[in-house]
Protein backbone atom coordinates (compact mmCIF):
# COMPACT_ATOMS: atom_id res chain seq x y z
CA UNK A 1 0.00 0.00 0.00
CA UNK A 2 1.50 3.31 -0.98
CA UNK A 3 0.44 6.89 -0.61
CA UNK A 4 0.42 10.05 -2.66
CA UNK A 5 0.05 13.31 -0.75
CA UNK A 6 -1.72 16.38 -2.03
CA UNK A 7 -1.64 19.41 0.24
CA UNK A 8 -3.39 22.26 0.39
CA UNK A 9 -2.94 25.58 0.39
CA UNK A 10 -4.73 27.90 0.35
CA UNK A 11 -4.66 28.05 -0.36
CA UNK A 12 -1.61 26.53 -1.76
CA UNK A 13 -0.82 24.28 -4.80
CA UNK A 14 -1.57 20.58 -4.59
CA UNK A 15 1.62 18.60 -4.19
CA UNK A 16 2.54 15.11 -5.35
CA UNK A 17 5.23 13.53 -3.28
CA UNK A 18 7.06 10.30 -2.50
CA UNK A 19 5.33 6.97 -1.97
CA UNK A 20 5.62 4.61 0.99
CA UNK A 21 4.54 1.12 1.97
CA UNK A 22 3.34 1.03 5.56
CA UNK A 23 3.96 -2.01 7.72
CA UNK A 24 1.06 -4.15 8.84
CA UNK A 25 0.97 -4.55 12.63
CA UNK A 26 -0.35 -7.72 14.23
CA UNK A 27 -1.60 -7.56 17.80
CA UNK A 28 -1.54 -10.83 19.77
CA UNK A 29 -3.33 -11.17 23.04
CA UNK A 30 -2.42 -13.73 25.73
CA UNK A 31 -4.87 -16.25 27.07
CA UNK A 32 -6.21 -15.90 30.58
CA UNK A 33 -4.92 -18.36 33.18
CA UNK A 34 -7.03 -21.51 33.46
CA UNK A 35 -9.04 -22.29 36.59
CA UNK A 36 -9.41 -25.76 38.06
CA UNK A 37 -12.93 -26.04 36.67
CA UNK A 38 -13.33 -26.39 32.90
CA UNK A 39 -13.90 -23.00 31.39
CA UNK A 40 -17.26 -22.34 29.81
CA UNK A 41 -17.19 -21.07 26.25
CA UNK A 42 -17.58 -17.32 25.99
CA UNK A 43 -20.90 -16.04 24.76
CA UNK A 44 -20.68 -14.83 21.20
CA UNK A 45 -22.99 -13.19 18.74
CA UNK A 46 -22.97 -15.11 15.48
CA UNK A 47 -22.18 -13.07 12.43
CA UNK A 48 -24.90 -12.72 9.82
CA UNK A 49 -24.74 -15.42 7.19
CA UNK A 50 -24.05 -12.89 4.47
CA UNK A 51 -21.33 -10.98 6.40
CA UNK A 52 -18.30 -10.32 4.24
CA UNK A 53 -14.83 -8.95 4.88
CA UNK A 54 -14.58 -5.42 6.30
CA UNK A 55 -14.63 -2.63 3.77
CA UNK A 56 -11.15 -1.56 2.64
CA UNK A 57 -9.92 1.87 3.71
CA UNK A 58 -10.75 4.64 1.26
CA UNK A 59 -8.29 5.27 -1.55
CA UNK A 60 -8.55 9.02 -0.95
CA UNK A 61 -8.90 10.80 2.36
CA UNK A 62 -9.71 14.49 2.45
CA UNK A 63 -8.75 16.54 5.52
CA UNK A 64 -10.43 19.90 6.15
CA UNK A 65 -9.42 22.39 8.85
CA UNK A 66 -12.34 24.24 10.44
CA UNK A 67 -11.13 27.56 11.85
CA UNK A 68 -14.04 28.45 14.14
CA UNK A 69 -15.02 25.00 15.43
CA UNK A 70 -11.37 24.14 16.05
CA UNK A 71 -11.46 20.69 14.51
CA UNK A 72 -10.58 18.55 11.51
CA UNK A 73 -13.16 16.93 9.23
CA UNK A 74 -12.10 13.72 7.48
CA UNK A 75 -13.94 12.83 4.27
CA UNK A 76 -13.91 9.54 2.36
CA UNK A 77 -12.81 10.74 -1.06
CA UNK A 78 -14.26 7.64 -2.73
CA UNK A 79 -17.82 8.11 -1.43
CA UNK A 80 -17.69 11.80 -0.35
CA UNK A 81 -19.08 10.81 3.06
CA UNK A 82 -17.74 12.33 6.27
CA UNK A 83 -15.76 9.64 8.12
CA UNK A 84 -14.84 11.44 11.33
CA UNK A 85 -14.30 14.74 13.09
CA UNK A 86 -11.22 15.24 15.27
CA UNK A 87 -10.52 17.97 17.83
CA UNK A 88 -7.40 20.04 17.13
CA UNK A 89 -7.10 23.35 18.99
CA UNK A 90 -7.74 27.02 18.37
CA UNK A 91 -8.13 28.37 14.84
CA UNK A 92 -6.72 25.56 12.68
CA UNK A 93 -5.92 26.98 9.26
CA UNK A 94 -3.00 25.95 7.06
CA UNK A 95 -2.60 22.18 6.58
CA UNK A 96 0.00 20.05 4.81
CA UNK A 97 0.58 16.27 4.72
CA UNK A 98 3.97 14.71 5.34
CA UNK A 99 5.62 13.25 2.22
CA UNK A 100 5.00 9.69 3.44
CA UNK A 101 1.32 10.39 4.10
CA UNK A 102 1.49 9.29 7.74
CA UNK A 103 1.05 12.71 9.34
CA UNK A 104 -0.67 16.02 8.80
CA UNK A 105 0.72 19.33 10.02
CA UNK A 106 -1.83 21.98 11.00
CA UNK A 107 -1.23 25.62 11.96
CA UNK A 108 -3.01 26.50 15.24
CA UNK A 109 -3.37 30.06 16.49
CA UNK A 110 -4.36 31.69 19.76
CA UNK A 111 -4.64 35.14 18.16
CA UNK A 112 -8.21 36.46 17.79
CA UNK A 113 -9.52 36.75 14.22
CA UNK A 114 -9.00 40.19 12.72
CA UNK A 115 -9.81 41.40 9.23
CA UNK A 116 -8.08 44.16 7.29
CA UNK A 117 -8.29 47.56 8.98
CA UNK A 118 -9.22 46.18 12.41
CA UNK A 119 -7.41 47.93 15.25
CA UNK A 120 -5.57 45.22 17.26
CA UNK A 121 -6.14 47.29 20.41
CA UNK A 122 -9.87 46.53 20.19
CA UNK A 123 -9.31 42.77 20.25
CA UNK A 124 -8.87 40.45 23.24
CA UNK A 125 -5.29 39.46 24.05
CA UNK A 126 -3.86 36.47 22.18
CA UNK A 127 -3.49 33.09 23.87
CA UNK A 128 0.13 32.29 23.08
CA UNK A 129 -0.18 28.84 24.67
CA UNK A 130 -2.57 27.94 21.85
CA UNK A 131 -0.06 28.86 19.10
CA UNK A 132 1.66 25.91 17.48
CA UNK A 133 1.82 23.32 14.73
CA UNK A 134 -0.26 20.26 15.48
CA UNK A 135 0.98 16.94 14.11
CA UNK A 136 -1.97 14.63 13.45
CA UNK A 137 -1.85 10.91 12.70
CA UNK A 138 -3.39 10.57 9.22
CA UNK A 139 -4.95 7.18 10.03
CA UNK A 140 -6.15 7.53 13.63
CA UNK A 141 -6.74 11.33 13.49
CA UNK A 142 -5.11 11.68 16.91
CA UNK A 143 -3.08 14.77 17.77
CA UNK A 144 0.43 13.39 18.35
CA UNK A 145 2.21 16.57 19.43
CA UNK A 146 2.18 20.35 19.14
CA UNK A 147 5.35 22.11 17.99
CA UNK A 148 5.64 25.68 19.24
CA UNK A 149 7.35 27.50 16.39
CA UNK A 150 6.19 31.12 16.63
CA UNK A 151 3.33 33.53 17.27
CA UNK A 152 0.11 33.23 15.22
CA UNK A 153 1.19 30.67 12.59
CA UNK A 154 -1.04 30.69 9.52
CA UNK A 155 0.44 28.62 6.71
CA UNK A 156 3.28 26.15 6.42
CA UNK A 157 5.22 23.93 4.04
CA UNK A 158 7.01 20.59 4.47
CA UNK A 159 10.29 19.78 2.71
CA UNK A 160 10.18 16.94 0.18
CA UNK A 161 12.35 14.73 2.40
CA UNK A 162 10.10 15.30 5.39
CA UNK A 163 12.85 16.66 7.64
CA UNK A 164 12.00 20.36 7.69
CA UNK A 165 8.90 22.42 8.33
CA UNK A 166 8.64 26.07 7.31
CA UNK A 167 6.11 28.15 9.26
CA UNK A 168 4.90 31.73 8.66
CA UNK A 169 4.35 33.52 11.99
CA UNK A 170 2.08 36.48 11.35
CA UNK A 171 2.50 38.34 14.64
CA UNK A 172 6.32 38.20 14.77
CA UNK A 173 7.01 38.73 11.04
CA UNK A 174 9.21 35.64 10.86
CA UNK A 175 9.59 32.34 9.05
CA UNK A 176 10.46 29.52 11.45
CA UNK A 177 12.53 26.59 10.21
CA UNK A 178 11.68 23.50 12.27
CA UNK A 179 13.58 20.22 12.55
CA UNK A 180 10.77 17.67 12.51
CA UNK A 181 12.76 14.87 14.12
CA UNK A 182 13.29 16.85 17.31
CA UNK A 183 10.39 19.28 16.97
CA UNK A 184 12.68 22.23 17.64
CA UNK A 185 13.11 25.53 15.83
CA UNK A 186 16.46 25.57 14.03
CA UNK A 187 16.28 29.24 13.12
CA UNK A 188 13.86 32.10 12.48
CA UNK A 189 14.22 34.34 9.45
CA UNK A 190 12.93 37.91 9.57
CA UNK A 191 10.60 38.63 6.65
CA UNK A 192 7.97 41.32 6.01
CA UNK A 193 4.80 42.48 7.72
CA UNK A 194 2.04 39.87 8.23
CA UNK A 195 3.60 36.78 6.63
CA UNK A 196 1.01 34.27 5.48
CA UNK A 197 1.62 31.97 2.51
CA UNK A 198 4.55 29.53 2.47
CA UNK A 199 5.47 27.50 -0.61
CA UNK A 200 8.63 25.62 -1.57
CA UNK A 201 9.82 25.80 -5.17
CA UNK A 202 9.49 22.38 -6.86
CA UNK A 203 13.27 21.81 -6.83
CA UNK A 204 13.31 22.36 -3.06
CA UNK A 205 16.06 24.99 -3.16
CA UNK A 206 14.02 28.08 -2.28
CA UNK A 207 11.08 28.69 0.05
CA UNK A 208 8.82 31.69 -0.58
CA UNK A 209 6.76 33.66 1.94
CA UNK A 210 3.96 36.09 1.06
CA UNK A 211 3.72 39.11 3.38
CA UNK A 212 0.30 40.77 3.30
CA UNK A 213 1.25 44.05 4.96
CA UNK A 214 4.43 44.37 2.94
CA UNK A 215 2.96 43.68 -0.52
CA UNK A 216 5.87 41.41 -1.33
CA UNK A 217 7.15 37.86 -1.59
CA UNK A 218 10.36 36.92 0.22
CA UNK A 219 12.66 34.25 -1.26
CA UNK A 220 14.81 32.28 1.21
CA UNK A 221 17.56 29.75 0.44
CA UNK A 222 16.64 26.41 2.05
CA UNK A 223 20.28 25.35 2.46
CA UNK A 224 21.56 28.47 4.19
CA UNK A 225 18.23 29.87 5.49
CA UNK A 226 19.42 33.25 4.22
CA UNK A 227 17.25 35.83 2.48
CA UNK A 228 17.76 35.87 -1.30
CA UNK A 229 15.36 38.55 -2.45
CA UNK A 230 12.34 40.66 -1.63
CA UNK A 231 10.01 40.64 -4.65
CA UNK A 232 7.31 43.38 -4.70
CA UNK A 233 4.12 41.93 -6.17
CA UNK A 234 1.09 44.00 -5.07
CA UNK A 235 -1.33 44.61 -2.19
CA UNK A 236 -2.13 41.82 0.25
CA UNK A 237 -0.50 38.74 -1.33
CA UNK A 238 -1.97 35.51 -0.03
CA UNK A 239 -0.83 32.25 -1.63
CA UNK A 240 1.70 31.02 -4.19
CA UNK A 241 1.56 28.29 -6.81
CA UNK A 242 4.34 27.16 -9.14
CA UNK A 243 4.49 25.69 -12.61
CA UNK A 244 5.80 22.11 -12.39
CA UNK A 245 9.24 23.15 -13.70
CA UNK A 246 9.50 25.88 -11.08
CA UNK A 247 10.10 28.62 -13.63
CA UNK A 248 7.12 30.81 -12.70
CA UNK A 249 5.33 31.61 -9.47
CA UNK A 250 1.72 32.82 -9.26
CA UNK A 251 0.64 34.95 -6.29
CA UNK A 252 -2.96 35.74 -5.34
CA UNK A 253 -3.44 39.45 -4.54
CA UNK A 254 -6.57 39.75 -2.43
CA UNK A 255 -6.93 43.54 -2.51
CA UNK A 256 -6.10 44.00 -6.18
CA UNK A 257 -8.34 41.35 -7.70
CA UNK A 258 -5.35 40.03 -9.59
CA UNK A 259 -2.65 37.37 -9.72
CA UNK A 260 1.00 38.42 -9.85
CA UNK A 261 3.48 36.41 -11.91
CA UNK A 262 7.16 36.32 -11.00
CA UNK A 263 10.27 34.68 -12.43
CA UNK A 264 11.25 32.11 -9.80
CA UNK A 265 14.78 31.71 -11.17
CA UNK A 266 15.67 35.41 -11.43
CA UNK A 267 13.45 36.34 -8.45
CA UNK A 268 11.77 39.23 -10.24
CA UNK A 269 8.22 40.43 -10.85
CA UNK A 270 6.93 39.89 -14.39
CA UNK A 271 3.28 40.93 -14.76
CA UNK A 272 -0.24 41.14 -13.34
CA UNK A 273 -3.21 39.07 -14.47
CA UNK A 274 -6.47 40.86 -13.60
CA UNK A 275 -9.55 38.82 -12.68
CA UNK A 276 -12.67 40.63 -13.83
CA UNK A 277 -15.95 40.66 -11.89
CA UNK A 278 -19.41 40.36 -13.38
CA UNK A 279 -22.07 43.06 -13.19
CA UNK A 280 -22.72 44.27 -9.66
CA UNK A 281 -21.08 41.29 -7.96
CA UNK A 282 -18.26 41.92 -5.46
CA UNK A 283 -14.77 42.31 -6.87
CA UNK A 284 -12.83 39.04 -7.04
CA UNK A 285 -10.60 38.61 -3.98
CA UNK A 286 -8.00 36.01 -4.95
CA UNK A 287 -7.12 33.66 -2.09
CA UNK A 288 -6.02 30.08 -2.78
CA UNK A 289 -4.00 28.90 -5.78
CA UNK A 290 -3.46 25.48 -7.33
CA UNK A 291 -1.68 24.51 -10.55
CA UNK A 292 -2.65 21.62 -12.83
CA UNK A 293 -0.14 18.74 -12.76
CA UNK A 294 0.73 19.37 -16.42
CA UNK A 295 1.06 23.12 -15.87
CA UNK A 296 -1.72 23.92 -18.33
CA UNK A 297 -3.97 25.82 -15.92
CA UNK A 298 -3.70 27.91 -12.77
CA UNK A 299 -6.77 27.77 -10.50
CA UNK A 300 -7.64 30.64 -8.16
CA UNK A 301 -10.31 30.79 -5.44
CA UNK A 302 -11.75 34.27 -4.95
CA UNK A 303 -13.28 34.60 -1.49
CA UNK A 304 -16.45 36.70 -1.38
CA UNK A 305 -16.70 36.60 -5.19
CA UNK A 306 -17.55 32.88 -4.78
CA UNK A 307 -15.90 31.82 -8.05
CA UNK A 308 -13.04 29.57 -9.08
CA UNK A 309 -11.02 31.21 -11.86
CA UNK A 310 -9.03 29.48 -14.60
CA UNK A 311 -5.83 31.08 -15.95
CA UNK A 312 -3.88 30.00 -19.03
CA UNK A 313 -0.23 30.43 -17.95
CA UNK A 314 1.01 30.31 -21.55
CA UNK A 315 -1.03 33.41 -22.41
CA UNK A 316 -1.23 34.92 -18.90
CA UNK A 317 -4.97 35.42 -19.33
CA UNK A 318 -8.09 34.18 -17.49
CA UNK A 319 -10.11 31.66 -19.48
CA UNK A 320 -13.28 31.73 -17.38
CA UNK A 321 -14.74 31.09 -13.95
CA UNK A 322 -17.73 29.52 -12.25
CA UNK A 323 -19.36 29.69 -8.83
CA UNK A 324 -18.23 26.98 -6.42
CA UNK A 325 -19.50 28.12 -3.01
CA UNK A 326 -19.58 30.89 -0.42
CA UNK A 327 -16.18 32.53 0.05
CA UNK A 328 -14.00 29.67 -1.24
CA UNK A 329 -10.52 29.72 0.26
CA UNK A 330 -8.47 26.52 0.43
CA UNK A 331 -8.21 24.36 -2.69
CA UNK A 332 -6.73 20.93 -3.39
CA UNK A 333 -6.59 19.07 -6.71
CA UNK A 334 -7.17 15.34 -6.99
CA UNK A 335 -4.55 13.23 -8.80
CA UNK A 336 -4.87 13.75 -12.54
CA UNK A 337 -6.05 17.32 -12.05
CA UNK A 338 -9.61 16.74 -13.28
CA UNK A 339 -11.36 17.37 -9.96
CA UNK A 340 -10.78 19.63 -6.95
CA UNK A 341 -12.07 20.41 -3.48
CA UNK A 342 -12.66 23.96 -2.24
CA UNK A 343 -13.27 25.01 1.38
CA UNK A 344 -16.23 27.41 1.63
CA UNK A 345 -16.14 29.36 4.90
CA UNK A 346 -19.56 30.94 5.55
CA UNK A 347 -21.58 27.96 4.30
CA UNK A 348 -19.58 25.44 6.37
CA UNK A 349 -19.07 23.04 3.50
CA UNK A 350 -16.60 21.76 0.95
CA UNK A 351 -17.34 21.65 -2.78
CA UNK A 352 -16.20 18.81 -5.01
CA UNK A 353 -15.89 20.40 -8.45
CA UNK A 354 -15.37 19.00 -11.93
CA UNK A 355 -12.69 21.13 -13.57
CA UNK A 356 -13.51 19.86 -17.06
CA UNK A 357 -17.24 20.60 -17.07
CA UNK A 358 -16.82 23.50 -14.60
CA UNK A 359 -19.61 22.30 -12.38
CA UNK A 360 -20.07 21.57 -8.69
CA UNK A 361 -20.53 17.83 -8.28
CA UNK A 362 -21.34 17.79 -4.58
CA UNK A 363 -21.28 19.96 -1.46
CA UNK A 364 -20.19 18.21 1.73
CA UNK A 365 -21.08 19.67 5.15
CA UNK A 366 -18.06 19.99 7.45
CA UNK A 367 -17.24 22.07 10.55
CA UNK A 368 -17.59 25.79 11.17
CA UNK A 369 -15.64 28.09 8.85
CA UNK A 370 -13.61 25.56 6.84
CA UNK A 371 -10.25 27.02 5.81
CA UNK A 372 -7.73 24.54 4.39
CA UNK A 373 -7.89 21.26 2.46
CA UNK A 374 -5.33 18.46 2.13
CA UNK A 375 -5.46 15.01 0.53
CA UNK A 376 -3.74 11.70 1.18
CA UNK A 377 -4.16 9.22 -1.68
CA UNK A 378 -3.55 5.47 -1.31
CA UNK A 379 -2.14 3.95 -4.47
Tell what function each PLM region has.
Residues 6, 11-23:
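Bacterial N-terminal signal peptides that target proteins for export
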Residues 34-379:
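Predominantly soluble domains enriched in secretory-pathway, periplasmic, or organellar proteins
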Residues 21-31:
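Bacterial N-terminal signal peptides
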Residues 4-9, 31, 270:
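Compositionally biased, low-complexity segments enriched in small residues
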Amino acid sequence: MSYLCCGIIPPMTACHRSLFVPAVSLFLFGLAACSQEPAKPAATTPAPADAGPPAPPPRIRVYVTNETSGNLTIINGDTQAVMATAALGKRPRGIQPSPDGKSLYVALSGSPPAGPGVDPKTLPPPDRNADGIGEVDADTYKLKRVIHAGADPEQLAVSADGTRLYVANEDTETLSVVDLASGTVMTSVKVGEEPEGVTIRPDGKVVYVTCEGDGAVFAIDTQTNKMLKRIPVGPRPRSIGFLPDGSRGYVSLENQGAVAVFDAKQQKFLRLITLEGQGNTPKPRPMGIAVAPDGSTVYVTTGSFSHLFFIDPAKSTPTGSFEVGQRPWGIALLPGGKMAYTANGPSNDVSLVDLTTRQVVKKIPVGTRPWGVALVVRQ
